[in-house]
Amino acid sequence: MTFKESAINESFWRNFSKIYKKPALVNKYLAGHSDEIEKVVITNFNEFNLSSEYSIYANGGFGRREMFPSSDVDLSIVQHNKNSKNTEGLERYIAKLWDVGLKVGHSVRTIQDIKKVAGKDPVEFTSYLTRRSLISSPDIDIKVNDILSRSWGKKKFFNAKYNEQEERY
C-alpha cells in the first residue's frame, strides 16, 4: 500500500487561502487527513497480524483527528503481555509505516509499563488519558482506564501540570 501524504499536503497548501478563511474547512481537512492516515495505520497493523498481541492507540493531534501537514503520527502500542512473540512483526510494521512516508512517533509498553510511567509523568499520563483506540480489546481498554483512574489525585495532577507549564513557558 502506498500513501500519498505529499499529495494531501500539496492540496492543503494549494488551497490554503480558501481553506484558511473558513474554519469549518480547516477542521474538515484535518479530520480527513487524520482519517487517511488512520486507514494506513490500521491496514498495515492488520497486515502484520498484530491484534492478538498488541493494541494500538492514536495520540496527540492524530488522536484528536487534527493532523496538520507534516505532523508526526503519534502511536501508543500496548503489548498484551510481556511474553509477546511477534516482536519482529511489530518492528516490520513500524518500518513499513516509515517506508510509506509517515513520521511515526511511537511507544511500545506493557500494562505494567503504563502503570509505572503514567504514575510518574504527567505528560505521559495525559497522553494515555487522551488516547483514541484504533485497534484494541475492551479488556485492555478497561485495564488502561483502571490504571489511569488510580494514577493521580486531582490536586497532585493539577500541581504537576501547572509546574510543567511553568517550566515550558
Say what each PLM segment does:
Residues N27, N59, R64, T126, ...:
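Generic secondary-structure boundary/loop-capping signal
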Residues E5-N9, N86, F158:
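Generic alpha-helical segment signature
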Residues M1, K143-R150:
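Charged, low-complexity surface segments at secondary-structure and domain boundaries
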Residues S34-I42, F48, S76, T87-K143, ...:
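Conserved catalytic core of two-metal-ion nucleotidyltransferases
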Residues I37-T87:
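Active-site nucleotide-donor binding segment shared across nucleotidyl transfer reactions
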Residues M1-S52, S70:
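N-terminal regions immediately upstream of nucleotidyltransferase
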Residues K22-Y29, H33, K85, R150, ...:
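Non-transmembrane, amphipathic alpha-helical segments
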Residues M1-F3, V26, G32, I77-H80, ...:
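Metal-dependent phosphohydrolase cores
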